[in-house]
Amino acid sequence: MSLIDVLIVDDEEDIRNIIAAILKDEGFNPKVAANSTQALKILAEKPVSAVILDIWLQGSEMDGLGILEVIKKRYPLMPVIIISGHGTIETAVNAIKMGAYDYIEKPFNNDKLVILLKRACEVTKLKRENIDLKSKVIDKTELVGNSTITLKYKAEIDKAASSSSRIMIHGKVGSGKELTARLIHKKSKRVNNLFIIFSPTCMTLEKINQELFGEAEKQESNNNSNKRPTILEFANNGTLYIDEVSNIPVPIQIKLLKFLKDHTIKKPCGKIVKVDIKIITGTSKNIQEEVNNGRFLEDLYYRLNVSSLKVPSLFERKEDIPLLVKYFVKQLSKFSGLKERVFADETIAALQSYEWPGNIRQLRNVVEWTLIMNPITSGNNEIIKPYMIPSEILANSVNLTKLEDSFDMLSMPLREAREVFERQYLSAQMSRFNNNILKTSSFVGMERSALHRKLKLLSLHIPPTGRINEEEYEEANA
């Protein structure tokens, strides 16, 4: 395994040699420079993993802060630890603002320097892995659909992304709260920094406290695992998405509320760390009810819910199902090796007639299950038919291909049987198009007024939402 290259920049030869010896013993590969010219030349030849940089460099064209500025412009992810024997608080603050990873004064504790360096390298490694991962994994930041409600929601996401306010995303399980958070990050000014997800569900109070704020005091001196940065530190300059925020216990809510007031973390060792984070939270619960029942702090709710987004359920955007199915089939073909196939129109109709309590996640699972359980054999199963999808989906959706009363209709006069068919057929189509009169009439080939009369004649209820959706649709397609 190759050694980690570290550049030491100090005008004092003794200091350079001492630090180099320490790092060599710890398995690093130290490089040394006495001034800005040497330092920048070494970096130009081959960038290093980290830099230990003195501020006051006698006989150098640039001082440490000047070198730091150049490094952060050319190598933004490269961690720089500032050291100085003549530093002031103001100098330290300026260095951190300019992008230094940390600042320590001479004479420094050898162990402290090594721990700090290892931590800096670990953080940078994670950042690089995160960036690499973005180009390799499935694009999870695409909101698929062109229905009126989806287009409106996309516009709301764009507005939220342009704001620096905290955002709370409300939505049912599987509806796309995490996707919304990713989209906000992707469209924001923080897009080149980390997007971190924290889910407190199934975590103990102690574990949540450890992940967000650090180890307990009694553990501080026992091991070095607590030296790793907390999630709040990892997310610095980026976006932190807290999923199901209502699952955070009240004692941690109090600490989180305190953090939101000044964005500082007091580590168990006493060190104060200030961070700059965009915080987005998600919840499938009614937070106001949680507040009323004493399970969620009212003040915390108001601080997190500065901007609010409501994710539309899949039931509300059934028109997007054909596009979503095509999207999932393509993704599964690309990343799971399942052959790309077409879902028949009647299969799509059956999917649109289902209520989808599990939302987008459930639809994706159904598409995957269907492709796996119906492999192509001798040219068969190229087209996905209704009988191939899970039976529970068909059982709970209005079946357009086999009427429930088909046997009873054999004993009915034609007029009565036709009325039974029309009632079931139009009920299914209204459900499929989310009670939108315009879209239903267009699909079944009837004038809107004629469809209205037919529904009334068949005693089929027309919810008011159908008319509202219709108006929105007409405006969107004017």
Swiss-Prot record:
Gene3D superfamilies named in the record: 1.10.8.60, 3.40.50.2300, Homeodomain-like, P-loop containing nucleotide triphosphate hydrolases
Residue list for modification 4-aspartylphosphate: 54
Keywords in alphabetical order: ATP-binding, Nucleotide-binding, Phosphoprotein, Transcription, Transcription regulation, Two-component regulatory system
Superkingdom in the source lineage: Bacteria
Membrane-traversing stretches: none
InterPro entries with a match to the protein in the record: AAA+_ATPase, CheY-like_superfamily, Homeodomain-like_sf, HTH_Fis, P-loop_NTPase, Sig_transdc_resp-reg_receiver, Sigma_54_int, Sigma_54_int_dom_CS
GO molecular function, one term: ATP binding
Response regulatory domain boundaries: 5-121
Keyword RNA-binding assigned: no
Residues holding ATP: 171-178, 235-244
Domain spans labelled Sigma-54 factor interaction: 143-372
GO biological process: phosphorelay signal transduction system; regulation of DNA-templated transcription
SUPFAM superfamilies: CheY-like, Homeodomain-like, P-loop containing nucleoside triphosphate hydrolases
Function: Member of the two-component regulatory system RBE_0312/RBE_0470.
Protein name per the record: Putative response regulator NtrX-like
Organism of this sequence: Rickettsia bellii (strain RML369-C)
Lineage of the organism: Bacteria, Pseudomonadati, Pseudomonadota, Alphaproteobacteria, Rickettsiales
